[in-house]
A protein has these predicted regions:
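Conserved N-terminal catalytic/coupling substructures associated with nucleotide/phosphate chemistry
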Residues: 1-278
Length: 278
């Protein structure tokens, strides 16, 4: 409206949009990126400077840790790890997720809830449950390693040799976890990624629907419109994915009909079904 207010149409009524709703609407349209937003109460002491040094040495061949403090600060500012907010320098959401000492202290929604069930339903007996915490790369590495422990590994006999059946190729599992961490909506503060392993499948449920007018059909053909541009850049530089839009097509090629994408309310769910054994 002319007075700067935004209204949402719900059924036969209109109501003023909340700050959180506006944030998600602007994110979905690609107008703002939450991962470059400042996190209140943070400062440079919340950044693991050794991790930053490792990144800059590996990717840019910059000896970050031995730079003068003012040069370190300028580099953090120029790369959106530090963001100015109300005359103070705060760590960005992406900066915390990539280089924070304790990301979940300020972003509790950024952990992954991991659970393993005995059967194929969430009401079945619980075998294991863990909350996975850490930086984005730690979340990915821990979630993949933990999942591999619980994915069934049946074997068949061919001739005189035992052959292990690979239900979910490692590259597919890793791609699925990377996508969840990289593309979830971190502005939804009460939701965490859910990674559930059942007797017949893996379900990864991420907060937020597809962003920037992406559709289920478009992602099948490698179309991408990232919600979190900071995370995409840094995870790409660290070789957690190749940035060519090949991930989903690769998963479809590997699993065929054993993969499913769906929206569940404001959530995005990826299901990877295990192969059926005779």
């Amino acid at each position: 409206t002319q007075d700067g207010k935004y209204w949402l149409h719900a059924g036969s009524t209109n109501r003023m949009a909340t700050k959180e709703e506006l944030s998600r609407l602007f994110q979905q349209a690609g107008l703002v990126h939450f991962d470059t937003s400042p996190v209140a109460s943070t400062n440079i002491s919340d950044i693991d400077l050794k991790a930053v040094d490792h990144y800059y040495r590996s990717y840019y061949e910059i000896d970050f840790i031995n730079l003068p403090e003012d040069e370190q600060r300028n580099l953090l500012i120029n790369t959106d790890i530090l963001i100015e907010h109300e005359s103070n320098w705060r760590v960005s959401v992406g900066g915390l997720l990539m280089f924070g000492k304790q990301p979940q202290r300020y972003l509790p929604q950024s952990s992954i809830m991991f659970a393993v069930f005995k059967g194929d339903d969430i009401t079945d007996d619980l075998i294991d449950k863990k909350e996975i915490s850490g930086t984005a790369t730690e979340l990915i590495d821990k979630a993949v390693s933990l999942s591999q422990l619980y994915i069934p590994k049946p074997s068949t006999i061919e001739g005189n040799q035992r052959k292990e059946v690979i239900h979910i190729p490692p590259k597919v599992l890793r791609e699925a976890v990377v996508n969840a961490v990289m593309h979830r909506d971190y502005s939804i503060g009460i939701r965490k990624i859910q990674l559930h392993i059942y007797s017949n499948r893996i379900e990864i449920t991420s907060p937020g629907t597809l962003a920037n007018k992406l559709t289920m059909e478009k992602i099948r053909y490698g179309n991408s419109a990232p919600r979190n541009i900071f995370l995409v850049k840094y995870l790409d530089n660290l070789r957690y994915f190749d940035g060519l839009g090949r991930g989903i097509p690769m998963m479809l090629k590997a699993l065929g009909e054993r993969i499913r994408f769906e929206h569940v309310g404001e959530l995005f769910r990826l299901t990877l079904y295990f192969s059926q054994q005779d």
